[in-house]
């Protein structure tokens, strides 16, 4: 039986919010908040994959297992691919990528993503989404939108508003079409993870800065379904960080 592992990619030099992995949230760095949240799950192991000796030292100080990776990876998935190779995970094992900037991610959603990959044998990756109810979120590029087919396989991910109902204003869109926000959690089998790092990086991946588009561009399937529980958006900006801090201080 395949083991299931959680790997948290943690890059120090974030472009939108520098050093956010170490940002203080109610007395603890964000990476520790994420780690402590995912330890509530019952998976076989939890690893932090980072390019930073500073993050490694801090993470090990609170008991995390850490793999130090190169600092030139194009995405968190590339970083995880290096980490699982170093760790020697079996090809049939499943790895769940939990973003290092989502300290409030529900454990139920992590388990759901892993089970979805097990259930959808044609998919090489699984992920989650939730319905957008606020029109402003449709046009926020930090909220990645997704459209999917009738069999719950992703068609496209974008920072733009997709779909778009022609003939209606931007404010009217929310009442016409269904919009779904992608939740940045992925499950993959180790065999595909190792292959992912060798795949062609497409122009659309570079334009959108979305690593999952590499999977679609190269002809593979991503299974997707609505999350069991609502997931607060990740921390991309200082405003996001302040919102999360308030939630922890309640």
From Swiss-Prot:
GO BP field: CMP-keto-3-deoxy-D-manno-octulosonic acid biosynthetic process; lipopolysaccharide biosynthetic process
Catalytic activity: 3-deoxy-alpha-D-manno-oct-2-ulosonate + CTP = CMP-3-deoxy-beta-D-manno-octulosonate + diphosphate
Subcellular location: Cytoplasm
Pathways involved: Nucleotide-sugar biosynthesis; CMP-3-deoxy-D-manno-octulosonate biosynthesis; CMP-3-deoxy-D-manno-octulosonate from 3-deoxy-D-manno-octulosonate and CTP: step 1/1; Bacterial outer membrane biogenesis; lipopolysaccharide biosynthesis
Cellular-component GO terms for this entry: cytosol
Entry's Gene Ontology molecular function annotations: 3-deoxy-manno-octulosonate cytidylyltransferase activity
Tagged with keyword Plastid: no
EC number from the UniProt entry: 2.7.7.38
Database matches in InterPro entries: Cytidylyl_trans, KdsB, Nucleotide-diphossugar_trans
Domain of life the protein comes from: Bacteria
Entry keywords, A to Z: Cytoplasm, Lipopolysaccharide biosynthesis, Nucleotidyltransferase, Transferase
Chain's role: Activates KDO (a required 8-carbon sugar) for incorporation into bacterial lipopolysaccharide in Gram-negative bacteria.
PANTHER family: 3-DEOXY-MANNO-OCTULOSONATE CYTIDYLYLTRANSFERASE, 3-DEOXY-MANNO-OCTULOSONATE CYTIDYLYLTRANSFERASE, MITOCHONDRIAL
Family: Belongs to the KdsB family.
Protein name from the UniProt record: 3-deoxy-manno-octulosonate cytidylyltransferase
Organism: Francisella tularensis subsp. holarctica (strain LVS)
Lineage: Bacteria, Pseudomonadati, Pseudomonadota, Gammaproteobacteria, Thiotrichales
């Amino acid at each position: 039986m395949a083991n299931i592992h959680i790997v948290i990619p943690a890059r120090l030099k974030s472009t939108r919010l520098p050093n956010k992995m170490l940002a203080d949230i109610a007395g603890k760095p964000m990476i520790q908040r994420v780690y402590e949240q995912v330890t509530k799950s019952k998976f076989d192991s939890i690893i932090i994959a980072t390019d930073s000796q500073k993050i490694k030292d801090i993470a090990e100080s609170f008991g995390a297992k850490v793999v130090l990776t190169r600092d030139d990876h194009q995405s968190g998935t590339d970083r995880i691919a290096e980490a699982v190779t170093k760790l020697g995970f079996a090809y049939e094992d499943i790895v769940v990528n939990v973003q290092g900037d989502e300290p409030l991610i529900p454990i139920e959603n992590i388990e759901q993503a892993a089970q979805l990959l097990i259930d959808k044998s044609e998919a090489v990756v699984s992920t989650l989404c939730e319905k957008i109810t606020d029109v402003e979120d449709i046009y926020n590029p930090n909220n990645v939108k997704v459209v999917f087919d009738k069999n719950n396989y992703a068609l496209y991910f974008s920072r733009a508003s997709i779909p778009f109902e022609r003939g209606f204003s931007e404010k009217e869109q929310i009442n016409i079409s269904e919009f779904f926000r992608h939740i940045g959690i992925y499950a993959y089998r180790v065999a595909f993870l190792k292959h992912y790092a060798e795949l062609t990086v497409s122009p659309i991946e570079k334009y959108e800065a979305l690593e999952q588009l590499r999977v679609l561009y190269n002809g593979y399937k991503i299974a997707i379904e609505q999350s069991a529980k609502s997931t607060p958006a990740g921390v991309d900006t200082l405003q996001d960080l302040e919102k999360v801090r308030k939630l922890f201080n309640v």
